[in-house]
Amino acid sequence: MRIGFGLPVSGTWATPERVARIAEAAEQRQYDSLWSFQRLFVGAEQDVDPVYRSVLDPLVALAFAAARTERIRLGVAVVNLPFVSPAYLAKQVGSLDVLSGGRVDLGLGTGWSEAEFVATGASGQRRAARTREFVAVLRTLWRDEVSAFDGELYTLPPGRMAPRPAQEGGVPILLGGSVPAALRRAGEIADGWVSRSAHDLTRIGRDVELVRAGAEAAGRDPDALRIVCRGVLFRPGGEMLTGSWEKIREDVAWLGTQGVTEVFYDLNFDPTIAGPDVDPDAAEERALDILHNLDPRGLS
């Protein structure tokens, strides 16, 4: 089981100094990865979780963390693909992979906020087809000597994008989603799946089976998939990843029996850490305490 940690990207604790300190501390304690997420825009009257009201750009945050670390992987869960062109994202993520020495993982989602669709001029229609074409464009840009794509939603004239990502074959792509079709699609076309912040982890085994079934139906090896769980800690009323340190470790071990290959602890959804009115020093102190007590070297 690989263990990661969410960067401070939401709320008052999302400052340059704290991003750097959390990134460095996670690497020193042998965490496997650092993660960010995307929230572009919140409508003035939109009813959303307060942690969404101030969020750093996910790729900029990862680039900042990359400059302060050497080994730890850098993931985003997720970039909402309707809001950006695949060619533009391929260039951004490929460049980050080069500059970080081949450490990037790209999670992709299809978005849910109507305000963000309006703000970006994006369409929320045909999400399945859009996802398939988007992934295909990324891969031809990262893999082929001459890239080209002629789809219903995206077109790429013959050409080249350089430099290519440092990782052979391109940056690993993880798809989000929680409905059966999206889960199967992750197994069919992606390198793995990443769960969302509100996912019911008590049923994750059933979701993993759908991801694996998608891979099998596509003639792919389901054992080669990465199954990444966003571990929101201490969720009020939650059954998983709450309680004592020992209980949280037991929960992580149980997730492994359900087919999860990676868990990252994400504190950005804890209102006592990432809320808009939280004292940032207290938030960082609490986060470092969690990072220390859940040190992956203590997970059997």
Question: Locations of the language-model features?
Answer:
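N-terminal beta1-alpha1-beta2 module of alpha/beta enzyme domains
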Residues: 1-68, 171, 268, 277-293
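Hydrophobic faces of well-ordered beta-strands that scaffold small-molecule active sites
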Residues: 3-7, 34-36, 73-77, 104-108, ...
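Active-site mouth loops of central-metabolism enzymes
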Residues: 5-17, 77-87, 167-178, 232-246
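Active-site-proximal loop/turn and secondary-structure-junction residues that shape catalytic pockets
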Residues: 9-11, 40-41, 80, 110-114, ...
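Short, acidic/polar
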Residues: 14-26, 88-93, 175-185, 241-255
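An alpha-helical appendage that flanks or caps ligand/catalytic pockets
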Residues: 27-28, 32, 125-167, 195-300
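Glycine-enriched alpha-helix->loop->beta-strand junction motifs that scaffold or abut catalytic
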Residues: 30, 68-71, 100, 187-193, ...
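Internal, glycine-rich beta/alpha segment that forms the wall or movable "lid"
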Residues: 42-49, 76, 82-189, 205-223
